From Swiss-Prot:
This is Large ribosomal subunit protein uL13. The gene is rplM. The keyword Cytoplasm does not apply. One of its GO terms (cellular component) is cytosolic large ribosomal subunit. This protein is one of the early assembly proteins of the 50S ribosomal subunit, although it is not seen to bind rRNA by itself. It is important during the early stages of 50S assembly. GO terms for biological process: negative regulation of translation; translation. It comes from Aquifex aeolicus (strain VF5).
Length: 144
């Protein structure tokens, strides 16, 4: 008996909506990454993108534990001499809360083309409104 291998065109994709109000950042991000990879499906294969679409609303109401608001820093470089930039988590949550969740999930996905395709299925919004009502997203309860 041969092992069944699913083809990318056979994958059924659903849309999920997650409310981030009061949820812990890391726990929420790991659940979202699991859905984006497709690990919740019985036919999961690591080399096939079989994940679903995830919409995150109320990103500005995310919660973090400990002293991370002041101590956690995000770094990037402009590729110019002396171009190392840094921002604290507190600044990021005030100005770009969508980016905080997107980066947390991105760092939990594979670092290759497949991971890039998975990240494109993540939609993060600051408030409770999103433009994806036509896809009929189902609410996903995350215990985070």
């Amino acid at each position: 008996m041969k092992t069944y291998r699913i083809k990318p065109e056979e994958v059924e994709r659903k849309w999920w909506v997650v409310d981030a109000t009061g949820k812990t950042l890391g726990r929420l991000a790991s659940e979202i990454a699991k859905i984006l990879r497709g690990k919740h499906k019985p036919y999961y294969q690591p080399d096939v993108d079989c994940g679903d679409f995830v919409i995150v609303i109320n990103a500005e109401k995310i919660r973090v534990t400990g002293k991370k608001l002041e101590q956690k820093k995000y770094y990037w470089h402009s590729r110019y001499p002396g171009g190392l930039k840094e921002r604290t988590l507190k600044w990021m949550l005030e100005n770009k809360p969508e980016e905080v969740i997107r980066l947390a999930v991105k760092r939990m996905l594979p670092k290759n083309r497949l991971g890039h395709r998975m990240l494109k299925k993540l939609k993060v919004y600051r408030g409770p409104e999103h433009p994806h009502q036509a896809q009929k997203p189902q609410p996903l309860e995350v215990k985070a």
